[in-house]
Amino acid sequence: MSVDTLGWSAQDWIDFHGKSTPEHSYNTLLSLLKSQKSAPEDPAWISLINEANLAHQWKVLQSKANKQQLPLYGVPIAVKDNIDSKGSPTTAACPAFEYNPSADSTVVALLKDAGAIVIGKTNLDQFATGLVGTRSPYGKTPCVFSDKHVSGGSSAGSASAVGRGIVPIALGTDTAGSGRVPAALNNLIGLKPTKGLFSCSGVVPACKSLDCVSVFAMNLSDAERCFKVMAKPDLENDEYSRPLPSNPLQKYPKNVTIAIPKEVPWYGETENPKLYAKAIENLKVAGASIVTIDFEPLLALARCLYEGAWVAERYEATKDFFATNPPESSLDPTVTSIIKTATKYDAADSFRYEYQRQGILQKVDQTLKDIDVLCVPTCPLNPTFEEVAAEPVLVNSRQGTWTNFVNLADMAALAVPAGFRPDGLPQGVTLIGKKFTDFALLELANRYFKVAFPQGSRTFGKFIDRQVTTKDDELRGPDISPEDSVKLAVVGAHLKGLPLYWQLEKVNATYLGSPKTSKNYKLYALPKTGPILKPGLRRVGEETGSQIQLEVYSVPKENFGEFISMVPEPLGIGSVELESGEWVKSFICEEFGYTQKGTVDITKYGGFKKYIDFLKQEEAKVKKPFETVLIANRGEIAVRIIKTLKKLNIRSVAVYSDPDKYSQHVIDADLGVALNGRTAAETYLDIDKIIKAAKDTNAQAIIPGYGFLSENAEFADKCVEEGIVFVGPSGEAIRKLGLKHSAREIAEKAGVPLVPGSGLVTSAKEAKEIANKLEYPVMVKSTAGGGGIGLQKVDSENEIERVFETVQHQGKAYFGDSGVFLERFVENARHVEIQMMGDGYGKAIAIGERDCSLQRRNQKIIEETPAPNLGETTRTKMRQAAESLGSLLKYKCAGTVEFIYDERRDEFYFLEVNARLQVEHPITEMVTGLDLVEWMLRIAADDAPDFESANIVVTGASIEARLYAENPAKDFRPSPGLLTDVHFPEWARVDTWVSKGTTVSAEYDPTLAKIIVHGKDRNDAIMKMNKALNETVVYGCITNIDYLRSIASSEMFKTAKVATKILDSYDYKPCAFEVTSPGAYTTVQDYPGRVGYWRIGVPPSGPMDAYSFRLANRIVGNHYKAPAIELTLNGPKILFHTETIIAISGGIAACSLNDKPIEQNKPIQVNRGDHLAIGKLSVGCRAYLAIRGGIDVPEYLGSRSTFALGNMGGYNGRVLKLGDVLFLNQPELASSSLPGPAYEPQAPPANLLPKISDDKEWTIGVTCGPHGSPDFFKPESVEEFFSEKWKVHYNSNRFGVRLIGPKPKWARKDGGEGGLHPSNAHDYVYSLGAINFTGDEPVIITSDGPSLGGFVCQAVVPEAELWKVGQVKPGDSIQFVPISYQVARQLKESQDAAIETLEDGKLQTLTSDLILPTYEDPVLVQLPKKSNLSPKVTYRQAGDRYILVEYGENQMDLNIAYRINQLINLVGKHKTVGIVEMSQGVRSVLIEYDGYKISQGALLDTLVAYESEIQFDKNWSIKSKIFKLPLAFEDSKTLECVTRYQETIRSKAPWLPNNVDFVAEVNDITHKDVENMLYSARFLVLGLGDVFLGAPCAVPLDPRHRFLGSKYNPSRTYTKNGVVGIGGMYMCIYAMDSPGGYQLVGRTIPIWDKLKLGSHSQEHPWLLTPFDQVEFYPVSEEELDRFTEDCENGKFPVQVEESVFDHKNYLKWINENIESITEFQKSQGGAKADEFARLIQVANQELESSTTNKSAVEEEYPEDAEMVYSEYSGRFWKPMVSAGDTVTKGDGLVIVEAMKTEMVVPAKKSGKVLKIVHKNGDMVDAGDLVAVIQ
């Protein structure tokens, strides 16, 4: 059915396509095209596209995933014929000038990208020279209202096409008015943008420095739509291109000032002045203020255009053409004469006229300084063809009166209709604004139309009977849409550059401006209750108020709620009145906020920033207490201290141990001093080293923090002796307070209540006697203890002597003091402490109390202030007692007086004084606003604050939770490790030293962070603490975060029923399970795995049998993304710490729960404490354990799957080990990013279970290709592949399944450039499931396999059949059968439906009727070669979800590499429907696609269509980074890889014992020549993933560096990360410890930054991308080891240079060196190549007959031996038994020490010790073998 589309707007077309089918839409466009005729029949069209071009455009458009959302979807457009549009010739209205562009101009490309369809090229004044539209040999285009009147020039044809409604949009160009005059003469909108906003790349220039592409449209909406599409910077291709400002002017004020000319020459015209006058009146009615000015400066500027050297620009654009002496019949004489006048100008004239222009512009600026807009007649006349013929130059000149100056003055213009004359002809006016006012001009035009054409009475083009609807003139403005956002004014810490600005960034806010409020406001600084000062904005009367400076932002509505949630009390969101009278959302302050004590009125400063500046100035006036201070500590306290030092502008000095070399405190400090040691004793406790560091750095003071030397009297005294201030109490005070018996004496003197106890006790016997007198229970304490060490409770006398000796030992070991005393134990005691400060001269002040009762093993867990349930009288007494004690001692600096509080009796007793800053000091700071570290520094400098006038007010409540690296499900054992993901809530205070990439050492305290919140009261603080804990994420080591969440949300904590021992009986229920036996190879996987990184060399991992995995998840009701466990051959044993539901699917094994058999493939309820055992698999190779909710492991690159070889994903990037504790997903937590269960648990019907072979015979369907017969394999070889059975090799795993079977019969003698063996190919990207012939041996590439390689693949196991590959065992037999793509999809879709529904009968399996009778030709389509730059293209089937696209012949060609890059970019630009990933090889690209979104056939059609979209010449260039990397040539680690290969895999080979010698020998060069090549070559990266994780396949750019060579055969099983190899012409850098085959020559830094720690890898973990370049520079092995360590910690500055690879220059260089290059290439061929081939052939024959291969030697133990594994990571301290000793089950075998904790590894059974594996000092990981018992 035909559709009348004439007069349709862009939106009409879009609406039509939205309701139509693609076929009907296409046919409608085709009908429109066929209805048009080109010149001479229709002079508006120079050419029209053909049907093939239209079909091609439509096919490309349909391939785009987002086509329906495109702003110009399916909208036909016309293009002026001086603008390149691929598929149509460009003539510039000169037949002799005609050429066929190879690419679209930038503007046309942008419009096509936005969905537009170009239907033809329009007529113009030749070479865009003229304003009349008559200067073209293709005919004279009339205006759409009269065949006697001109359409205007030079864009006459474009205006006609829109004016007649053929297309809604057409492109013109505008140098001097050609985008505006035709609009006026055809009743259209003519948008002439700010110069440079639209690219002119691909436009035949008229006057290049002034040219603009313009838009003709029927309505404002279409004009704006095009403007937003086309206004994109194109800096690389257009010298005059520039970006639109991010916040362009959107509208003029209501009373916009519009200037009109004082005098308007009309040249005898009488009707047009009336229309102009009417337009001016309408603008007045619309609110404009009209002023009359002298336009002479602008008119003088206009005269420059044709009087000055700008005419020479027209000549510059065409001089080469005119030099060819084109036929005069093709030239317009007027145009030619104008252009040739340029010959009279010389270079000096250019400068003279430019000086003249600049002088005029100065006058113009003065004239327009108070003007917003100019309004002029678009053109004075409506000329007839006869009038133009009579006076062609004069009429043209008059028409340009009001247009010529606009581009010279760098202004924007919009021509709009003004109505009709009595003769029915239209006219218009032009609105002209300053640059970048384009949006504002459109909005002003809209205002004008509403007055000039009320109720939508405006018509468009020739359609005087149709009206423009208000919808079609609707404007959206810039993409910052008010409809989708909230305007928010900020007044305080959210201002740019202040601490909370990040919150605006987080919610994607856009800065709009910096207005002030109206005069009705006051601004206050509220009392500081934390690190950030808060403002309070209050509305008052104008008589007392002022204007306050604001910043206004646009916040997306969907993010506004998130922003509000971060607003702290007493602030809220209300509204504020701006100086303009507009009301916007803003911060307001509750009344109690600005009335509370401590609030400061800061209105006089006019704004918050100025007040902050004032505070900084005041701070600067205060004398710094010290110039340099050394922090004698590490971890979070060192980081926290440095913050204060920075605030006070004091230089900070950090000291660090070897493990802390890259710690945060070292990074933050101004100076760092290495202490050269690992243990605390060797470093942070070494007084001499600390003192030396202070003296070497001229530190005036040392601040010790807490722990280590903070309460060491000797250290304090030593500082004084050395003339260094110790920031803390005197050594004498530390001694008195540190020895608890003397502390009690002091307390007693100070009148502080004491708990009954003893003095120092010297023996266990004496301790026993005293304990009996005190009555049990008693506390045994080390007089020097702290931090929970040297402190134990004793309940009966049979324990007292043992405990006494233990505490005595701990005191001596940790604190160097064995003194011990006893104290009565107070039942249900609370721990309440007072923060005290002393000035050292007898004055002391109690700042507040803290309740620290929540302790585990005397280690504080959660602290809070004020202490709850504490009477004010008691609180006051405690403070007084603390002050009394401090005064008595003349205490100096911070100290904490700790009390035991008996809540029942409301009594407190002295516990001890911590003569240092406490861990929990931040909560006191939060409620007081003080900086206690600053107080300490000032006191230490004898500049103590005035305690009496301090007036400290406690505001609100604060809570701190300590985050420890310890395992709460394993008795809180230390849990060191590498942190792979760390996220803390940004709104809370978090004192920490860790971040992603931090290695938590076993050497020190396990504290990772302190999470601190502040609330208006305790309930509010508890709520915030729970929120903070729920948002906290730490992965890499087990932490107590789940334990903290449990406590903080408990009723016990809410009701403050706390006591120091309450956590001993707290029933913590971890949502976790524990591995008590790991099984053979047990990992965490998810489905579909790590998708989208195959091109980088990151395998998807995921389950090997995805169907069974998904089934297990579905049985328990999990979301499909839920991680579950894959087990191989032998399953694990698991202890559940929580109730849940499980299911086991896949291979068949003996499964039991609490030793009772359970069924597979059914949901099973498990309870807390249940033991699950999965035994050896009797059928199949792998089984799957799903747990309801899924397993909580971090997401890495979009997946939680384990890639153990790459140490990523899953649980710490590895297989599960004994003792691992894995937490389950808790979707209710804010920190959880994993969906919760999606279904109820349900058992599937039996026929949905996978049919796993129990007779070791398998039939597996495969698709043929990508490589087949006759080009790679002989036909009989392919037949044999399907007729024979293949045996599964013993060396099969997740990396690949090796097969044993008939040797292939090759159809070629070698791989050509790809390699010597016929299986070799230039590196390309394999399909997952590909059967890859590595030489003559096939391997099925599986979940953890490599992506990029150089071996052919005969067939691919499709996705639906891959589950079988996951279940085959070594020794099983496989019969491969060919199936079609359609069958493969059918099987896949049935599996998906079965999993989704669990409906009986949904699963379809491979049956004989689905098998093809014979193999298929994998070549789907082949396109012939068109040119050297458009080579042959072969599309190969590569499975049911991949197509391999190969270019050209079997040779490496950089033009092909670039073509592949262009195809990848094209797919990315179009977001092509269904394409998942594009993976680049040397001469090919593997395309992965989603069969649900696009079929194989449809994708082929799209790809074929794309080929004609790719156009370039040999002079292409591409962005390229040049990386300069350090290389240690033949370092020991590189040579170790070779030696290991020789010892374990192949003892003799041509490349052994030295790879470099081999390369040198076969190339007839020296060892040194190879080394020199590596340091002089530059390598170009062609692909990634060779082998794994971004490892590059790179080629030397200098052909003389491309050596003969061969890869290892067989390949290595181990290559060290960072090793560099060369294989023939290619270079590779191994990105992980992995297999490999390149010849090894040296080692560089790691190029895979897993955690993205380095500055060079912030976007992604891989270093290189295709077309990057690599150079090496020499370093020693020692230097490289240091660089590698820096790199692994994100501190190595990689040398990288942003560059462009210029192929033109490269070819020039090749030609300059062609003789030596040719000579080298000849030397590589002939006899040398033949000899090399013979050498490799002989070596391979020797390999086949050799039986001397060695296997790695493993120590063997008797069958009844029991392996004992460590459950902990730490340092092996000492064995408790020796080999030969007899032990019983439970006896201790060895001791592992970590984080101040000694952990015993017990015997699992009774027997004789065969071996203790480690020696003292060894580092032991959890799961490592430590002992063997028989």
Swiss-Prot record:
Q: Where is the Biotin carboxylation domain?
A: 625-1068
Biological process terms in GO annotation: urea catabolic process
Q: Which Pfam families does UniProt cross-reference here? A: AH_C, Amidase, Biotin_carb_C, Biotin_carb_N, Biotin_lipoyl, CPSase_L_D2, CT_A_B, CT_C_D
Q: Where is the Biotinyl-binding domain?
A: 1752-1830
Cofactors per UniProt?
Answer: biotin
UniProt entry keywords in alphabetical sequence: ATP-binding, Biotin, Hydrolase, Ligase, Multifunctional enzyme, Nucleotide-binding
According to its UniProt record, the EC number is 6.3.4.6, 3.5.1.54
State where ATP binds: G115, A116, I117, V118, I119, G120, K121, T122, K740, E823, N858
Q: Report the sequence similarity comment from the record.
A: Belongs to the DUR1,2 family.
* Subunit note: Monomer.
- Designated name of the protein: Urea amidolyase
